[in-house]
UniProtKB/Swiss-Prot annotation:
Record protein name field: Arginine biosynthesis bifunctional protein ArgJ
Organism of origin: Chlorobium chlorochromatii (strain CaD3)
Involved in the stabilization of negative charge on the oxyanion by the formation of the oxyanion hole (site feature) positions: T144, G145
Keywords carried by this UniProt record: Acyltransferase, Amino-acid biosynthesis, Arginine biosynthesis, Autocatalytic cleavage, Cytoplasm, Multifunctional enzyme, Transferase
Keyword Transit peptide belongs to the record: no
Gene label: argJ
Length: 429
């Protein structure tokens, strides 16, 4: 656990230092022990070992709001969505986006499990509601893990009964570790945001390593704030931040059955009003936090050794720029070239050419970081040695200009290695 924590802290510190935080944001100082005041006012969090799939580690997590909290959530676009996704989507509507708790298990996705899976997801909400003396529809349920297997409900129920005794408001490590599957390190961060009527805390935890593709993938993100925000505004802010973060990453091009990003606002702190400067400040902080968490997921991509920012500009529209960027980011040939540290620019423009984005190839321009690789007229006059220095770095950018408009989009991707095949070839064994 110490090695995992050290990896997390080193990676988080590096990304946080590289982030240009917006006005009024104070990034959290995270100690070497990982023990610090993490959660916003009005929240308590617990974790326990339900022994669902993993032994010797926590695999169940509970977030509780002391009072009804404004809630917002986004779910997978996969048509084969898991039972907890269906249930949570329904609960969000039934409760008028007022929630008290989020419960999550790892190791079993409760996906492709039919009517019994739906009954089991409901039973999880019912059990949490009974333990906390709240309504079942005030509970969001999330699961992640192997698809197509029923939950061991006796163990799940026992875990839920044990969770309330573990609730606390200081440490993040138990909760974030409990939601991990193939992740190699926990992903979390928090910031304070200075608003006109006081400072609020904004924090998030996430998991994800494989099945990561735009439109969210096998990733879970849980965010909390003590700001007072109406549910409608919270949903708008979360949706916009999600579009620029979790929906802008890819590891392997697969979209999961269980994706969920949920956010709770306890209302114990300063108010954020629609159309105010406070809304702009809070929105900018939320976007930066979620982008950091999204980058952590890409860095931890199964077998990944590189984090690459892919920007397409000069497109007819932002939508076409995103088409090209996604196709490049998901290209196996591009990803293997990234892993091999090969300046194979032809694979990049070939991917753009099949993306559906419109351009004239003679207008294309390409850069690795600030280094020109391809100039207009398909002139590739660059130093392979200088390019190799950039490609050997753990993190760098690829920028492609289509020369056909003002549209742009940025995504984050990683390389594709032999280890990815090894991890996913033995996932169930």
């Amino acid at each position: 656990m110490l090695t995992t924590l050290n990896k997390a802290l080193d990676t988080i510190h590096r990304l946080a230092a590289e982030t240009v935080w917006s006005e009024g944001v104070t990034p959290m100082k995270i100690g070497d022990s990982g023990e610090f005041g993490f959660w916003p006012k009005g929240f308590s969090v617990g974790a326990t070992a339900g022994n669902i799939r993993y032994s010797g580690r926590d695999d169940m997590m509970l977030i509780v709001s002391d009072s009804p909290a404004s809630a917002a959530a986004l779910f997978t676009t996969n048509l084969c969505c898991a039972a907890p996704v269906v249930l949570s989507r329904n609960h969000l509507q039934q409760s008028a986006a007022s929630m008290r708790a989020i419960v999550c298990n790892s190791g079993n996705a409760n996906a492709a499990t039919g009517k019994q899976g739906m009954a089991d997801a409901q039973a999880m909400a019912d059990a949490v509601a009974e333990q906390l003396s709240i309504k079942p529809e005030e509970v969001l349920v999330a699961s992640t893990g192997v698809i197509g297997q029923l939950l061991p409900m006796e163990r799940v129920h026992a875990g839920i009964v044990a969770l309330p005794a573990t609730l606390q408001s200081n440490s993040v490590l138990g909760a974030v570790s409990a939601i991990m599957t193939t992740d190699t390190f926990p992903k979390f961060y928090a910031v304070d945001v200075a608003l006109s009527s006081g400072t609020v805390r904004l924090c998030g935890i996430a998991k994800g390593s494989g099945m990561i593709c735009p439109n969210m993938a096998t990733m879970l993100g849980f965010l909390a704030t003590d700001a007072a925000i109406a549910p409608e505004l919270l949903q708008t802010l979360l949706s916009e931040a999600n579009r620029k973060s979790f929906n802008a990453i890819t590891v392997d091009g697969d979209t999961s059955t269980n994706d969920m990003v949920a956010m709770l606002a306890s209302g114990a702190g300063a108010e954020v009003v629609a159309g105010s400067k406070d809304e702009a400040l809070f929105s900018a902080a939320l976007q930066s936090l979620m982008i950091l968490l999204a980058k952590l997921i890409v860095i931890d991509g199964e077998g990944a050794t590189k984090l690459v920012e892919i920007t397409v500009k000069g497109a007819v529209s932002n939508e076409e720029a995103e088409l090209a960027a996604r196709t490049i980011a998901n290209s196996s040939l591009v990803k293997t070239a990234i892993h091999g540290e090969d300046a194979n620019w032809g694979r990049i423009i070939a991917a753009a050419g099949r993306s559906g984005a419109r351009f004239n190839e003679d207008e294309l321009e390409l850069w690795f970081n600030e280094m020109p690789i391809l100039k207009k007229g398909l002139i590739a006059d660059f130093s392979e040695d200088e390019a190799a220095i950039i490609l050997a770095q753990p993190s760098y950018s690829i920028t492609l200009s289509l020369g056909n408009g003002s549209g742009s989009a940025t995504l984050w991707s990683c390389d594709l290695s032999k280890e990815y095949v090894e991890i996913n070839g033995s996932y169930r064994s």
